[in-house]
């Protein structure tokens, strides 16, 4: 065995004998250079096991870090889902129609019946009525006391309708008596000629019996159906139906009044209310308005037309009369087809309104089969509570329209059940209201509950920030600030109390004013009545009415109560202003107490100012809700990362900078010595081997075994560079430790160093890259927590975090959509598979593999 020794094999100037031995003794003698003897196979297995352990430890650290990150992400997503669910529930609840609303309404003390029928006024869109939409109606178990002279809604309805028609229509005396006789209308089948014959026993024509009535004062004779007239004492005297029942007797009106499309309501104002007895013991309905009434709807035998297709065709007939004088008014005949019509009184003869843009006609129709009606234009009619002589344009209505309504409109029985009551004072009354007649809830952006919650949350945040500043800066001033705050609260409460007292006085003044106005109206009515009775001759300035003057008629409220109310209102105004000024001064003093130029104080004041400016406009835009929620969400989810980054900056900046300078210094000197070591190694190798390449490569391979690394390792930076970075000692001593004493430590350090650094491990070392980097890498590291403020700053990080959150939310949505599509595809596949199996089963049953049917054989 020949031993060849040479020096200078290890860089750094230490001469280490390296021997070239045979394969047999290589294992025993290499122990002086290695902690234990191993070959290539054992080296690979040990490296693999060590790498597996390192990977396992790295995975554990990554899982812990990922778990910490996921915990905050899950908390943020939970808060997001919770807020979204809460907002959705509030939105749904605000738009949900409430079936019953239980509460208290202060409507007064004892409810007594009132005879002031003129307190009931017309409210609606019709000209002459008040435009008002705030109707309410409550159910209560309060018992009502009614006087004998209590006004009903029907009486006020008579008065209002009479006023409307008398002020809008032309007066007429057509309700006088007519001399009528019964006639028959006979027609031939071959022509449209109809003969009028005087008979005793009449027969129906066109579904009606006919009368020929003569109005001698105007030399007018009309041919009218018997259903429009009323006989008096079984004589030849007849009057139009409804003349003895209605107040207004007018001739012609504007067409729009006759349409039946003007809804009105008869309503009252406090202290008056309308009460309807429900027919149950101690159960009533109280409100400010009665039922809806439509002007122009016929009172008797109405017909409710429904459906789109309705058509009426005029039937032109020639009426032949032997002899007559003056005007002879003939009827207009129609044949109508109603696809869907209902008779309100279950009678075969009904009244229907047919109109165009510029004309209207009231038809009296008789049903001859299921959908066909024989109709005739009426001459007289009862519209609302006014008896009218209807306009009869002698032409066909081409584009017919039919008014649609229900049978309960203008029901006299219902109007008689509503009574007028009067009350005074303030007394709570338990009530319940249905949504369609009482309190109507409207949808808002996030609902009123969400707005209130947002205001409370914003105020709480501002107050918390302000109080946090006080606690952090000047603890000794907290008591003083609290005293000022308590003064502000007390002043605000006192101001609210004064405002409530002022409102009560104002309400009493309004009630008294309304009562005086109603008294003036009643006096005007009495005066008009006296003028009609006693002052017939208009030339007399003074006249006798026949009734003694009552001093109570001119008695108004001449007490000093009104002056007392005015003085109290002035005093309360002054007290309210004084209280509010005091509250403002206390609030200003509390702010001055901690008014310092400190940045935290300025932040608290600015936050309070911004939120105070936001509160009046919270309901104006939904964007503020979204921005506020995103800011809160980012604050909750990003606080740990921000604090961790600040801790790394403050604690690791010094050590990181020191390691960075050492690294640069040793890297520069190591490059010089590395060049010198390579030159020495080449000279020594040339002198010893004498050009023997095989021995050189064997020693190279043996050296690789001794180092425990592959060729890829030789291309990486030397391990002694990382040794110096790991232990912080001198170059010579650390190089000796890394190459001879602890060869594995340098390898592990190299694997876990900058070359294999994992950004997800959450290391506290702050790496400062001299070559810089792009914004994307910077912000990604900022989001992961490894590099935050020194690189890209908080605003850019905040914007990028918002983009990441939106992207993740969109990703969740797309993944959910993919799951839904996958489930649908599976369902379709299942359905197709079931259909396939059924078809296959039926096919196999119809076409079995073995046929048991024997066919006849012919020989």
Swiss-Prot record:
Glycosylation sites: 40, 112, 141, 148, 186, 214, 233, 244, 340, 368, 399, 406, 411, 422, 483, 490, 550, 557
Spans annotated as Disordered: 745-764
Transmembrane segments: 615-635
Signal peptide span: none
Location of region: Fusion peptide: 446-466
Region Immunosuppression, annotated ranges: 498-513
Residue ranges, Cytoplasmic side: 636-859
GO biological process, one term: virion attachment to host cell
Residue ranges annotated as Extracellular topological domain: 7-614
Glycoprotein found in the keyword field: yes
Coiled coil, from the record: 576-624, 663-699
An annotated GO cellular component: membrane
A Pfam family that the UniProt record links to this protein: GP41
The keyword Cell inner membrane is annotated on this UniProt entry: no
GO molecular function: structural molecule activity
Propeptide: 1-6
Alphabetical list of CDD domains matching this protein: HIV-1-like_HR1-HR2
InterPro entries recorded: GP41-like (IPR000328), Gp90_EIAV (IPR001361)
Keywords: Cleavage on pair of basic residues, Coiled coil, Disulfide bond, Glycoprotein, Host cell membrane, Host membrane, Host-virus interaction, Membrane, Transmembrane, Transmembrane helix, Viral attachment to host cell, Viral envelope protein, Virion, Virus entry into host cell
Annotated site residues (Cleavage) in this chain: 444-445, 684-685
Protein modification: Specific enzymatic cleavages in vivo yield mature proteins. Envelope glycoproteins are synthesized as an inactive precursor that is N-glycosylated and processed likely by host cell furin or by a furin-like protease in the Golgi to yield the mature SU and TM proteins. The cleavage site between SU and TM requires the minimal sequence [KR]-X-[KR]-R.
Function: The surface protein (SU) attaches the virus to the host cell by binding to its receptor. This interaction triggers the refolding of the transmembrane protein (TM) and is thought to activate its fusogenic potential by unmasking its fusion peptide. Fusion occurs at the host cell plasma membrane. The transmembrane protein (TM) acts as a class I viral fusion protein. Under the current model, the protein has at least 3 conformational states: pre-fusion native state, pre-hairpin intermediate state, and post-fusion hairpin state. During viral and target cell membrane fusion, the coiled coil regions (heptad repeats) assume a trimer-of-hairpins structure, positioning the fusion peptide in close proximity to the C-terminal region of the ectodomain. The formation of this structure appears to drive apposition and subsequent fusion of viral and target cell membranes.
Quaternary structure, from the entry: The mature envelope protein (Env) consists of a trimer of SU-TM heterodimers attached by noncovalent interactions or by a labile interchain disulfide bond.
Full protein name: Envelope glycoprotein
Organism: Equine infectious anemia virus (isolate P3.2-3)
């Amino acid at each position: 065995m020949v031993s060849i020794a040479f020096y200078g094999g290890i860089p750094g100037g230490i001469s280490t004998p390296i021997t070239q031995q045979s394969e047999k003794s290589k294992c025993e003698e290499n122990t002086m250079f290695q902690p234990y003897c191993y070959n290539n196979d054992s080296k690979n297995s040990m490296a693999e096991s060590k790498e597996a352990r390192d990977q396992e430890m790295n995975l554990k650290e990554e899982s812990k870090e990922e778990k910490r990150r996921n915990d905050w992400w899950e908390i943020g997503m939970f808060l997001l889902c919770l807020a979204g669910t809460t907002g959705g529930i509030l939105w749904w609840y605000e738009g949900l129609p409430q079936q019953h609303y239980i509460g208290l309404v202060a409507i007064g003390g004892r409810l007594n019946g009132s005879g002031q029928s003129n307190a009931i006024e017309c409210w609606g869109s019709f000209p002459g009525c008040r435009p008002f939409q705030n109707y309410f109606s409550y159910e209560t178990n309060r018992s009502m006391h009614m006087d004998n002279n209590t006004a009903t809604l029907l009486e006020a309805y008579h008065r209002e309708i009479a006023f409307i028609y008398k002020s809008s229509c032309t007066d007429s005396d057509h309700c006088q008596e007519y001399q009528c006789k019964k006639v028959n209308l006979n027609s031939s089948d071959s022509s449209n000629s109809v003969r009028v014959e005087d008979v005793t026993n009449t027969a129906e024509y066109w579904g009606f019996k006919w009368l020929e009535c003569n109005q001698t004062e105007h030399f007018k004779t009309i041919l009218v159906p018997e259903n429009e007239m009323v006989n008096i004492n079984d004589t030849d005297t007849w009057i139009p139906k409804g003349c003895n029942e209605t107040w207004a007797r007018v001739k012609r009106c504007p067409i729009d009044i006759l349409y039946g499309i003007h809804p009105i309501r008869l309503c009252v104002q406090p202290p008056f209310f309308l009460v309807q007895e429900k027919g149950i013991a101690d159960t009533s309905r109280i409100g400010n308005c009665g039922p809806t009434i439509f002007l122009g709807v016929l009172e008797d035998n109405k017909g409710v037309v429904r459906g789109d297709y309705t058509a009426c065709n005029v039937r032109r007939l020639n009426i032949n009369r032997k002899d007559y004088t003056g005007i002879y008014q003939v009827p207009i005949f129609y044949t109508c087809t109603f696809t869907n019509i209902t008779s309100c009184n279950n009678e075969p003869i009904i009244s229907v309104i047919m109109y165009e843009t510029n004309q209207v006609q009231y038809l009296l129709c008789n049903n001859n089969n299921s959908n066909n009606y024989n109709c005739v234009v009426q001459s007289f009619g009862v519209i609302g509570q006014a008896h009218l002589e209807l306009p009869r344009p002698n032409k066909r209505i081409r584009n017919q329209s039919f008014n649609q309504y229900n049978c309960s409109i203008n029901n006299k029985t219902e109007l008689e059940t509503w009574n007028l009551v009067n009350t005074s004072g303030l007394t709570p009354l338990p009530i319940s209201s249905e949504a369609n007649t009482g309190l109507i809830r409207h949808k808002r952006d996030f609902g009123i509950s969400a707005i209130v919650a947002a205001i409370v949350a914003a105020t709480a945040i501002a107050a918390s920030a302000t109080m946090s500043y006080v606690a952090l800066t000047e603890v000794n001033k907290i008591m003083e600030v609290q005293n000022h705050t308590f003064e502000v609260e007390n002043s605000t409460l006192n101001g609210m109390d004064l405002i409530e007292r002022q409102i009560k006085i104002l309400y009493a003044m309004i009630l008294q004013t309304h009562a005086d106005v109603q008294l003036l109206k009643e006096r005007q009515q009495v005066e008009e009545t006296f003028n009609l009775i006693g002052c017939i001759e208009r030339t007399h300035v003074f006249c006798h009415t026949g009734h003694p003057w009552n001093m109570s008629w001119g008695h108004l409220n001449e007490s000093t109560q009104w002056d007392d109310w005015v003085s109290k209102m002035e005093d309360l105004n002054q007290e309210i202003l004084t209280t509010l000024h005091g509250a403002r001064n206390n609030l200003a003093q509390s702010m001055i107490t901690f008014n310092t130029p400190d940045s935290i104080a300025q932040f608290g004041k600015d936050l309070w100012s911004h939120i105070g400016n936001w509160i009046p406009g919270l309901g104006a835009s939904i964007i503020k809700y979204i921005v506020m929620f995103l800011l809160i969400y980012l604050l909750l989810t990003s606080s740990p990362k921000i604090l961790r980054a600040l801790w790394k900056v403050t604690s690791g900046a010094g050590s990181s900078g020191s390691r960075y300078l050492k690294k640069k210094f040793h890297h520069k000197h190591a490059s010089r010595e590395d060049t010198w070591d390579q030159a020495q190694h080449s000279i020594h190798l040339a002198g010893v081997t004498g050009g023997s390449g095989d021995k050189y490569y064997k020693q190279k391979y043996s050296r690789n075994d001794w180092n425990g690394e592959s060729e890829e390792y030789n291309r990486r930076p030397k391990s002694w560079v990382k040794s110096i970075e790991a232990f912080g000692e001198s170059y010579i001593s650390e190089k000796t430790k890394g190459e001879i004493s602890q060869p594995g430590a340098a390898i592990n350090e190299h694997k876990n160093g900058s070359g294999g650094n994992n950004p997800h491990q959450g290391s506290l070392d702050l790496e400062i890259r001299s070559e810089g980097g792009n914004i994307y890498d910077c912000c990604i590291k900022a989001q992961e927590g490894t590099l935050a403020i020194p690189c890209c700053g908080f605003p850019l990080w905040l914007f990028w975090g918002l983009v990441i959150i939106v992207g993740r939310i969109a990703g969740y949505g797309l993944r959910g959509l993919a799951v839904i599509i996958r489930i649908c595809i599976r369902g379709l596949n299942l359905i197709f598979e079931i259909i396939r199996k059924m078809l296959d089963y039926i096919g196999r049953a119809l076409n079995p593999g073995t046929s048991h049917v024997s066919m006849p054989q012919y020989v």
